[in-house]
From Swiss-Prot:
CDD domains according to UniProt: S1_EF-P_repeat_1, S1_EF-P_repeat_2
NCBIfam families: PRK00529.1, PRK04542.1, yeiP
SMART domains tied to this protein: EFP, Elong-fact-P_C
Gene Ontology cellular-component annotations: cytoplasm
One GO process term, biological-process aspect: peptide biosynthetic process
Native source species: Edwardsiella ictaluri (strain 93-146)
A GO molecular function held by the record: translation elongation factor activity
InterPro entries found in the cross-reference section: Elong-fact-P_C, NA-bd_OB-fold, Rib_uL2_dom2, Transl_elong_fac_P/YeiP, Transl_elong_KOW-like, Transl_elong_p-like_YeiP, Transl_elong_P/YeiP_cen, Transl_elong_P/YeiP_CS
Domain of life: Bacteria
Name of this protein: Elongation factor P-like protein
Record-stated family: Belongs to the elongation factor P family.
Length: 190
């Protein structure tokens, strides 16, 4: 058991009989004296894939579940199934396209480093991406000279179909770093 203020992104909890994976946490500190800090957590239900949102006070107790994390590499596509290979013992992990539809927007053809498969008692639960990914812009409007002084943005499409807002000075062919959870531009990639 852990208090709500000890829960971190990527942990798994058992709440109301559901196995939930923590996707995001917003901390809300009320201005009234004596009011408890609230933790608004966004989960994904591991078994159904549905998104769940709950609020907790800092001292609410939640049952945490230990998950096994295995580093994986994208291997190949078989029909509507995506196969990832364990980096250490070469065990294949298969996901249906619907299970990882959101994650696929961040995985270009060659794959990305830092992916992990979450398992519990031998059952594959989810695919976890790193916090940031580097991707190449394949389509955007031409860059505007001198636009680095303004904060205006424009849409840019990646090879996977993902569209993010980028500063006007960027052009097609440039590599950028994207925050996965927030789907936002962070900067140019190294």
């Amino acid at each position: 058991m852990a208090r709500a203020n000890e829960i971190k992104r990527g942990m798994a909890v058992n709440y109301n009989g559901k196995l939930l994976l923590v996707r995001d946490i917003d901390i809300q500190s009320p201005s009234a004296r004596g009011a408890a800090t609230l933790y608004k957590m966004r989960f994904s239900d591991v078994r159904t894939g549905l998104k769940v949102e709950e609020r907790f006070k800092g001292d609410d107790l939640l049952e945490t579940i230990t998950l096994s994390r295995r580093p994986v590499t994208f291997s190949y596509i078989d029909g509507d199934e995506y196969v990832f290979m364990d980096d250490e013992d070469y065990t294949p992990y298969t996901f249906k396209k619907e299970q990882i539809e959101d994650e696929l927007l961040f995985i270009p053809e060659g794959g990305i480093p830092g992916m992990q498969v979450l398992t519990m008692e031998g059952q594959v639960l989810a695919l976890e991406l790193p916090q940031t990914v580097d991707m190449e812009i394949v389509e955007t409007t031409p860059s505007i000279k001198g636009a680095s002084a303004s904060a205006r943005t424009k849409p840019a499409a990646m090879s996977t179909g993902l569209v993010v807002q980028v500063p006007e000075y960027l052009s097609s062919g440039e590599k950028i770093r994207i925050h996965v959870e927030e789907r936002r531009f962070m900067g140019r990639a190294d």
